[in-house]
Amino acid sequence: MDKWEYWLLVVLVFGSQFLSIPDATAQKNSLIVNVKNINRSEGKIYVALYTSNANYLKNDAISKCENALEGNLEIEFSDLPPGEYAVCVIHDLNGNENLDKNFLGVPKEGFGFLNGMMGNFGPPPFEKVKFTWNGAGAKIEVPLRYL
């Protein structure tokens, strides 16, 4: 082995640790929201995380939006501070960024809360759908309902 081959081998073996290689564990500190039971692949899926009862179901939320896919869809939230959160998901079929309701107030689009929780004649209270996020990787499930 000549001098150039030796240095090439050294660079390849030891230099590879300094290359920017995507980390396979990039999701370990992320919260994954698994939206289940999406009944069609049109419209958008909105996922909102609320930090308190005071901002629950108001516009002050940590949110993400993805194109709808029939079946299940995973949406990742990274860099969330530890704390209590409530999650709400809507399947916005017409793109107006709201949960459309009929004249009786019954949702016309898909919606869901943590673990499929339902309220009596309205959304469930914050206390029923909150969870504690400790900053470590986790996955939660939100099944959608269509009425």
Q: Where are the predicted features?
A:
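Bacterial Sec-dependent N-terminal signal peptides
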Residues: 1-28
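A short, amphipathic beta-strand motif
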Residues: 29-37, 47, 142
